[in-house]
């Protein structure tokens, strides 16, 4: 496991944080190959964790799981900022006929009106995503990869102020 190769000591905090806050890894559970059922399962698992007043962290290979994972947060919090790190916008309505594709995962998250989006590092966007991006410019801010030397991090801080932030990384 990759997590076994990480040092547990944090030099900034001068401690091993897991000893103070605790970390629990769930036992692996079966995920259905049907994407809608899989997303429903992820939503249910995260809801159970939130109901226990714990903080869930979910890991997948890319953003396909995010629309399911974020559902309990959309119910619990009135204003959520989805902080998205990726090379692609993932704002398509569907991809190859699949509404819940990796290429439309972030769009599915924005189906919830209380979710806003900040994307960092986008270098690719399809023509079909542009109208949605323009129509929702009040909810979406993209920090383009080509402009990284000009990113205004103070603007970023203002965008997330007083919001609950949900992080998603495409790896």
Language-model features, listed with the residues they occupy:
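Conserved alpha-helical scaffold segments that buttress catalytic/binding sites
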Residues: 1-171
């Amino acid at each position: 496991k990759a997590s076994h190769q990480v040092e547990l000591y944090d030099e900034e905090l001068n401690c091993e944080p897991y000893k103070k806050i605790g970390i629990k890894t769930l036992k692996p559970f079966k995920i259905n190959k049907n994407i809608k059922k899989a997303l429903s399962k992820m939503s249910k698992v995260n809801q159970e964790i939130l109901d226990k007043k714990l903080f869930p962290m979910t890991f997948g290979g890319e953003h396909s799981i995010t629309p399911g994972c974020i559902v309990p947060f959309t119910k619990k919090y009135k204003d959520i900022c989805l902080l998205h790190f990726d090379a692609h916008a993932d704002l398509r309505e569907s991809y190859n006929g699949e509404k819940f594709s990796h290429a439309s995962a972030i769009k599915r998250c924005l189906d919830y009106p209380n979710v806003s989006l900040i994307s960092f590092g986008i270098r690719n966007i399809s023509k079909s995503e542009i109208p949605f991006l323009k129509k929702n410019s009040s909810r979406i801010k993209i920090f383009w990869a080509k402009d990284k030397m000009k990113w205004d991090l103070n603007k970023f801080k203002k965008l997330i102020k007083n919001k609950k932030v949900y992080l998603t990384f495409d790896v």
